[in-house]
Structure formats: structure tokens, C-alpha cells
């Protein structure tokens, strides 16, 4: 006998719709969690085997029941009360789930602490539903590794196409879980394109915040300079709600100190359907027409929409440093330093406590762990862990100077812009090196059915402006379509 679910669940419910239904007694958080588990069983782990989910929280139903009871007896904590959320597998939780970053070496790693952002989610009343699959070590393993693959979890598939359709990464599972309606929300992380790429490839909204808006504490690191967590959702409204819940000053993360007085705990005031009217948006488009991720007609449609909605569109803007030959010294040296430090603090019973030990562990189970090799790890093994050498320091200084003063800030000031529009996620690198925010928005589908998206980018702590622009564009177009899972 099949389980019968509330017919309301057939639709992709938003946070606001769920809260209304819960207040009216039409659905419960427990029922919602059970429905998503059913979807995961039948479409993620069976059927088309999307494979976006790496681990399920065994306490999820209990947590949802407790929050349902609290709603009846004490009231609602806020908009996330009883709302299911998935976390990327590099975000620590103090529960019965593991935190492995997709590696087999850390498959038994259980944290004794919640990441700061997880503490925030629990206090807001969210139900942590589980962990999502990801590109192993946030794409720090191999130059040959396909986006969305991990030795522990296998390959994440794009729900909009066949197995060969690019899924984007490294927060692949987090984006796909939202796109395929296995959850309402998810949290990913980005160093460079890891939120923006899978968001555009899977037709969801992704926000890569200013570095420091969300605490990095409790996240398996890639760099110090560029790492940040950020939300995925099917609508800008839901992404904005989740973003506000994740912000806050963390005494354990100095990067968050600069957000004091600049971060918001509620971005709902930015959700203006007329937000494009009078906005000055610069268009940067250096993509060749033969790129698989670019569609000239769809991008021109975006520009026409901006113009129609009252924006002042300045095309072919100049960003002086965009095409410079960037040094990758920051990611090379900082991954060695940050990951070695993280591994060194792990409990003694775990098999690895350094990058060198991780490399040797993988070699010992080569057939399981090294489908794509580990050349990126091996390259970093010999790097020093002092962050004092000239190559690294000069790379760090150049990244900041050329991405900010001679990059994003230069263009914003020169043209008097509120934001810069990029097709797909081509602006990810310069924004990542600057530590500046971007928002990815669905912008239609190619003739093949492949999703197309655009990103709006701005200066530090301009998330409110970007949400305003993204929301107005979304409401004017309503491009997103649900994938067909069978």
C-alpha cells in the first residue's frame, strides 16, 4: 500500500505558502519532512537516481514533530519555523550526521559542534534534513574531476537533462536538491563559482554573499580569503529569507566583524517588484557565442526585460582587470594551510590528520577513492604552511587590488552603476577575489532544454540591492520551470 500525501505537496511550496498552510492546520512540518523523504527515496536514490543527497538526518522527523508541538503551544519562532533545509557536506553539525566534504577518509567524521550558521538555523526553527553531495573537497582534489562527483557520494545529476548535462559545482547537491523539490531550501558554499555555477545550471536562485556576512566557523575550508556559505532556493523571496537567518557577528570568525551595521537579519524589505525602475545596470558580456553555457537570444531577452522594467542599461562596460592573468597563489597556499590546520584538529581515531596523510589514504584505496586522481592535492602537498612567502603575499595583494579598485568598484564608480549583469556565472572569479556578492537568477531555457541563468554583482554588502534587482527581474519574467522527474 502506497503512502498517501497531502495534495498540496504536489506543488513547489514557498516558505510563505507553507507557513500559511501550517497556521491553517492544513499541513505539518512532520508531514512535509515525510514527503521530502519520499521524494528522495523515489527520485534521488531510485528512479532517475539524481543522487543529490549524501546523508539523511535520522532525527529529522522527531525535530519536525517537536516544532509542530511548539507551534501549537508557544507560537512560531519566525519564517523558518518547521522549514526543511539541507546542508552541503562540508558544513559541520553536532548530531548523528557526518561531515566529510565528499571524501572517504572523513566518512566517519562526526563533529562535536554545530557550525555557526547551523546554530542560527536551529534557533530559527529550521529542520536540518540532511547533507548534500558535492564536488569532493570543493573541487580541491583533481583537475579531471567532473563537477558534482565525490568518492563518497558518486555523481550528482542535473534534473533537467540526461546524465551528460553539466550539473555545476561544487555545491552541486545543494542546488539540485532544491531544483528537484527534495527540500524547500539548502545551504551551499563558494570559493569561486561553487554557488553561482550550480544555481545557473539547475534553474534555481543562489546567493553568494560578501565574505564575512556569514560566519565561516565550522566549514571545512578551501581558502581564508574567499570562502563563504550562501543560500539556494526556488524563489528570490525564499533565498532572501534564508540569507537573513544566516547572518550574524561570530566572535570566532574575524571576517564577520566588518559586517556589523551592514548585515541585515531580514532582507524582506528589499523585495520590491518595481526594483528595476531607475536602476543603473552595466552589462558585461565577453562570452564567445560558441560557449555551451551561453545563449545570445536569452541574454538579449534579459537586457530587453531590464529596459522594459525601467532600468537604465549601460552595455559593453569596461572592467579593466577582468581579462588579466590572475595568479592562483591564494587558493594554492591557503588550501594547504587551511585544510592542513582543519585536519590536524580532527579526533585521533580518524585516519588522516594532514594533506599528506589524506593523499596516502587515497592511494591505499585507489580504486574507490581515485577515479579522477588527486593531482590538485598532490600539487599542494609541498607548499609551506606559513603564508609568508613572497609569491603568496603578492598574489593576495594583487587579488584585492585588481578585483576591487581596478575591477568591480572601478566599473561601478565609472558608470555610476547599482550592479553589473553577467551572463551565466562568468563574473564569479573577479567577485570571488574581491570577496563581493552576487545573485544568480533563472533566465530561461535553451532550445535543448538546458537552463540558462544570469548573475547580478555588486560591491561589498550590497546584498540588499542585488536582491531588489533580482526579485524585480524574477517577478517580471517568472522564467523558472520545474524539472520533470520520471
Where are these regions (language model features)?
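Short, well-ordered alpha-helical
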Residues: 1-107, 134-139, 258-263, 267-268, ...
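Acidic-enriched catalytic cores of C-N bond-cleaving enzymes acting on peptides and small amides
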Residues: 11, 236-265, 288-322, 334, ...
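Sec-exported extracytoplasmic/periplasmic mature domains
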Residues: 20-24, 37-49, 65-72, 122-123, ...
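Short helix-loop capping/hinge segments that flank enzyme active sites or metal/cofactor-binding pockets
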Residues: 81-101, 270, 275-284, 333-403, ...
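Short glycine/serine-rich loop segments
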Residues: 113-250, 423, 433-455
